[in-house]
Amino acid sequence: MIIYVHTAGRPHRQTTIKSFSADLMKRTRLVVQDAEKDKYNIAPLKDNLVVLPPHINRLSPTRQWILENTETDKFVMMDDDLTFAHRGPYTKTKLYQANPQDVEQMFSELEYLLDT
């Protein structure tokens, strides 16, 4: 499963991928507009870049392009400003900030569900 994080105008504020483990980053693609590709040529982002064609500069066409050009049949599209939380083991109401291992577990469970 590939994780696509579409982003624009925030090369130094990547909230979503800050929650990802190194293993999860290997499956993540940061989708950027052609006009901004040089701004995202920074570690750790530069190794995961997917640059859109120059005529695509809005969110809806970006999502459509990802859908039509993905490398796999299982993928997730996410915004670049997400935070993650989970419920604690002894409460059904309190939320706890998720660490990278929690987020990786979430994606593992999602992939398992997509396979069943």
Regions found by a protein language model. Name each.
Residues 3-24, 36-44:
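Short, well-formed alpha-helical segments that are part of the catalytic scaffolds
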Residues 14-19, 95-112:
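Well-ordered, non-membrane alpha-helical segments in soluble/globular domains
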Residues 31-78, 83-103:
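Active-site-proximal specificity loops/subdomain of glycosyltransferases
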Residues 22-29, 44-50, 108-116:
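Structural alpha-beta junctions
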